[in-house]
């Protein structure tokens, strides 16, 4: 890592990369994060934790080691994300430069991506990783009535093509205006997506 940081500072072949580099995410495996002090390197490059953010005290612990940021992911916990955002804002009042990044973990079309977008917006972030649509084709096997209901309620966020409702990505951006509604970023009520009449037998297996 030391060699990489020095190369970013001195290698002319890396000038364009260095000029565009915002931060280096999770430079070590989660289990090794706490074994290395990055304060000497962090004067020129910002480092953030991602996978190592596995507890409510992870960000403050990482701060001591020179990390300046932490990722926000719904799957890691809404309240943890809010707490870390408050921490960064508090520390920055002292003239420091800590931040939250918006990362993804395959948030699917529907509530998952909508609520994560709302969380990102709450933090005031304009750039976010979105990769769920790379792994699952829109609403995929979701019942057509349900997918259509989401499309009708959030027509700025979704579009329909080739018979499938998908996230509407235009020039690298997605619209979020329709998410500003009561109900945590969803304009639908449970009954709006149609009745669920399928019956499933639940069997208990005792070993």
Language-model features, listed with the residues they occupy:
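Catalytic core of soluble alpha/beta enzymes
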Residues: 1-111
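Flexible C-terminal active-site loop/helix
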Residues: 94-99, 103-207
């Amino acid at each position: 890592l030391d060699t990489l940081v020095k190369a970013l500072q001195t290698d002319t072949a890396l000038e364009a990369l260095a000029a565009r580099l915002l931060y280096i995410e999770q430079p070590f495996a989660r289990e090794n994060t706490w074994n290395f002090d990055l304060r000497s390197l962090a004067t020129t490059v910002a480092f953030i934790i991602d996978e190592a953010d596995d507890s409510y005290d992870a960000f403050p612990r990482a701060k001591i080691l020179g990390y300046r940021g932490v990722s926000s992911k719904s799957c890691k916990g809404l309240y943890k994300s809010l707490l870390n955002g408050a921490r960064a804002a508090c520390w920055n009042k002292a003239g420091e430069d800590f931040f939250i990044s918006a990362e993804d973990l395959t948030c699917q079309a529907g509530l998952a991506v909508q609520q994560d977008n709302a969380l990102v917006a709450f933090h005031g972030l304009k750039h976010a990783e979105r990769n769920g649509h790379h792994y699952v084709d829109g609403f995929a096997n979701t019942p057509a009535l349900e997918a259509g209901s989401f499309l009708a309620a959030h027509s700025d966020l979704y579009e329909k093509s080739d018979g499938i409702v998908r996230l509407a990505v235009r020039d690298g951006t997605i619209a979020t205006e329709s998410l500003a509604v009561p109900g945590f970023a969803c304009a639908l009520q449970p009954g709006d997506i149609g009745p669920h009449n399928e019956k499933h037998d639940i069997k208990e297996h005792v070993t």
